A protein has these predicted regions:
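N-terminal secretory signal peptides
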Residues: 1-12
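Flavin (primarily FAD) binding-site architecture
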Residues: 305-321
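Conserved flavin/dinucleotide-binding core of flavoenzymes
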Residues: 19, 37-38, 148, 284-286, ...
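Dinucleotide-binding Rossmann-like beta1-alpha1 core, especially the glycine-rich loop
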Residues: 95-170
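Active-site/ligand-binding neighborhood in enzyme catalytic cores
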Residues: 174-277, 282, 291, 299, ...
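Glycine-rich FAD pyrophosphate-binding loop
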Residues: 68-90
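N-terminal export leaders
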Residues: 12-29
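N-terminal Rossmann-like FAD-binding beta1-loop-alpha1 element of flavoenzymes
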Residues: 50-76
Length: 490
């Protein structure tokens, strides 16, 4: 049986935040894939072109594979020394072959395009969340063990919830505050995103939306996980991918996908190539970049740029972008994400009937990525968002580790005694992304119409240009879309 057809368990508690914007909304919000299915046998191009692709992340690799398959000459320029971009699995400095995700961690069961690539490259998947074991809930200094799939007993916690919130519990807050929005989403036509009917929400952030309905500070903190300032439209849009019965991860590490995609393109990728200038001429495009300390220039008929706009805005271009494109390049926001990974001598929490995952009263998630990896040692890791992620990113690695170990000791007493080592990662501090994933803020949704439009011979791909920002699916979809544009260009 295909691993994608295994039983679909109930939503993990972390997903309840947006579970009410479910399958009906997903059908409305997700546009169709391009007709060129990955691995399909498209008709070879009658007029092959040379195409430079900036970035060997998932979007760039998807575009390159498709164009190469139909006869175009492709060259990828990648600043890093590895493929994958923000799909990045950390294996060092961990022992015994352990690994954890610094980048994209979850693959929704509804993301058929991503799963088709996983099947194409014969990779296996495992459930992202453990399917057994209790979880820890740490709120206002009170630690509580919650049975798998259950909700915390509010009588044992110090909370500042309203009477009606206490009545439904933490597990009912999403339903309490999203029922009306769910009905509105279901009623919308399939006419593209963002919908005109949603214009009344264009100046509303997520936290404000909750507070307008009487949500308490604790309810807002629990539901938003640090995304209070996120546009309500952005939150609703992203909710579709979360509100699924199952999330997967790739066995062996999510970076196995971009590594597999890069293998047939190995001689067409130039690593360590930092782009300095993009120039369009009447005849084509010129890209100036540095590699090995030397200035290099490449020319081509067309160019696909997958560089995040947070980085692209510092690259010289000639001629300048159109006004709409320049504005979105200048203003687009990539949310900060910081992660701390702690290796322990044993997975002692499992002997206590726990699976290692936890919910805390801070804008972060706590994961146990090694729950299904072989060996005795384990990793506990944090996934920190927004304000707190920015705060962590400004600390030294040792300060981040000390702070996280102190928190983990509250969640899983005994971490200090079992501690063997740790490492950190900040996408805000990573020079080739300067952020983790696109977050659309209040007032910015109307600018999105410019994010994916070509500029002359330059085409754009990447999660930020897709209907699924922040997801592998978005990167793949955008790469195929850009490849289609190039192939169909006159």
């Amino acid at each position: 049986m295909s691993p994608f057809l295994h039983d679909a368990h109930a939503l993990n508690r972390r997903q309840f935040v947006i579970r009410t914007l479910a399958v009906g909304a997903a059908l409305a919000l997700q546009p169709a894939f391009p007709q060129n299915v990955p691995g399909g046998r498209d008709r070879r191009s009658a007029s092959p072109r040379k195409v430079i692709i900036l970035g060997a992340g998932v979007a760039g690799l998807a575009a390159a594979l498709k164009l190469h398959e139909i006869g175009h000459e492709v060259m990828l320029l990648e600043a890093r020394m590895r493929p994958g971009g923000r799909v990045h699995t950390i294996r060092e400095p961990f022992s015994d072959g352990l690994y954890a995700e610094a980048g994209a961690g979850r693959i929704p069961i509804t993301h058929a395009l991503t799963l088709s690539y996983i099947e194409r490259f014969k990779l296996a998947v495992d459930p992202f969340y453990p399917e057994s074991g209790g979880e820890v809930f740490l709120w206002n200094g009170k630690r509580l063990v919650v049975p798998h799939g259950g909700d915390p007993d509010l009588a044992q916690l110090q909370t500042n919830l309203t009477p009606r919130e206490r009545k439904v519990g933490f597990g009912g807050l999403s339903k309490l505050y999203f029922d009306a929005l769910r009905e509105q989403v279901h009623a919308l036509p399939e006419a593209g995103w963002p919908y005109p009917d949603f214009k009344r929400y264009k100046d509303v952030n997520y936290g404000e939306f909750l507070r307008r309905q009487g949500a308490s500070p604790d309810a807002v903190a629990y539901l938003s996980q640090g995304f209070e300032e996120d546009s309500l439209l952005d939150f609703a849009h992203d909710a579709v991918s979360h509100a699924v019965p199952k999330l997967w991860k790739i066995r062996g590490g999510n970076d196995l996908l971009p590594r597999a995609m890069a293998e047939p393109l190995a001689q067409r990728i130039r690593y360590g190539a930092e782009v300095r200038r993009i120039e369009q001429t009447v005849a084509g495009v010129r890209v100036a970049y540095t590699a090995g300390g030397a200035q290099q220039v490449e020319t081509a008929d067309r160019l696909i740029c997958t560089i995040p706009f947070t980085v692209l805005r510092d690259i010289d271009v000639s001629p300048m972008w159109s006004a709409g494109k320049a504005a979105v390049v200048r203003n687009i926001y990539l949310g900060p994400v910081a992660r701390v990974f702690v290796q322990t001598r044993t997975r002692f929490w499992e002997q206590q009937g726990l699976n290692g995952f936890a919910t805390v009263d801070q804008p972060m998630e706590l994961w146990s990525p090694t729950y299904n990896q072989p060996g005795a040692r384990g990793i506990l890791m944090s996934y920190t968002y927004e304000r707190l992620a920015r705060e962590y990113s400004h600390l030294s690695p040792q300060e981040q580790i000390d702070r996280m170990v102190a928190l983990l000791e509250q969640v899983h007493p005994g971490v200090r005694a079992q501690f063997e080592g740790a490492t950190t990662w900040s996408w805000l501090n990573e020079p080739y992304s300067k952020g983790a994933f696109t977050v659309t803020r209040v007032g910015e949704f109307e600018d999105l119409r410019h994010v994916a439009t070509p500029e002359g011979r330059v085409h754009f791909a990447g999660e930020h240009t897709s209907p699924w920002p922040g997801w592998i699916q978005g990167a793949l979809h955008s790469g195929l879309r850009a490849a289609t544009e190039v192939n169909e260009a006159g």
